[in-house]
């Protein structure tokens, strides 16, 4: 990617993690040079060790929304909860109490069906878990561990660096989980 000062190109990577809700351990990682997250959901799920059980449900933010991700997760027997767009903040009471309405028709678009699914009580509860599962892990890696950029060049070396960062996070987390309170 060309930088803004016309001084050459910057390499940018897109790092992904799959985090277990109850343990908040990183279960799988992936790294790509894709400009957005859409093509990274399925490779990250596929990176999950076969000895671990696959998740039954997966909550993803709107950067992952695509028909191919929905179909791919369903084909892996994973129920997707993927935001279809930005969620409005500070909604009025009228909007919050608005009725759910009728379910979309069978021939409705994937976006309409997913938007309805996320408006159900089960959908809201499941999507809400994403905020307290994945986001704190990323925040700890960036703020507490101070990892904000890759120091090695090339995607293979950067991927190794990302795995080491995630292993370091998991060691810190395991220490918290097994330490007596």
What are these model-derived regions, one by one?
Residues 1-181:
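Anion-binding and metal-coordination hotspots
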């Amino acid at each position: 990617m060309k930088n803004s000062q016309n001084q050459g190109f910057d390499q940018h990577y897109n790092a992904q993690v799959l985090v277990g809700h109850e343990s908040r351990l990183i279960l799988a990682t992936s790294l790509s040079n894709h400009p957005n997250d859409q093509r990274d959901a399925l490779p990250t799920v596929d990176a999950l060790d076969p000895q671990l059980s696959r998740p039954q449900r997966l909550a993803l933010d709107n950067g992952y929304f695509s028909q191919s991700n929905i179909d791919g997760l369903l084909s892996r027997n994973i129920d997707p909860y993927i935001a279809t767009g930005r969620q409005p903040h500070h909604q009025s009471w009228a909007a919050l109490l608005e009725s759910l309405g009728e379910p979309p028709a069978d021939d409705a678009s994937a976006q309409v069906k997913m938007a309805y699914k996320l408006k159900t009580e089960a959908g809201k509860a499941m999507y809400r878990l994403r905020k307290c599962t994945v986001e704190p892990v990323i925040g700890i890696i960036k703020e507490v561990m101070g990892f904000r950029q890759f120091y090695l060049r090339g995607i293979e070396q950067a991927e190794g660096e990302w795995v080491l960062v995630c292993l370091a996070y998991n060691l810190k987390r395991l220490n918290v989980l097994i330490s007596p309170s």
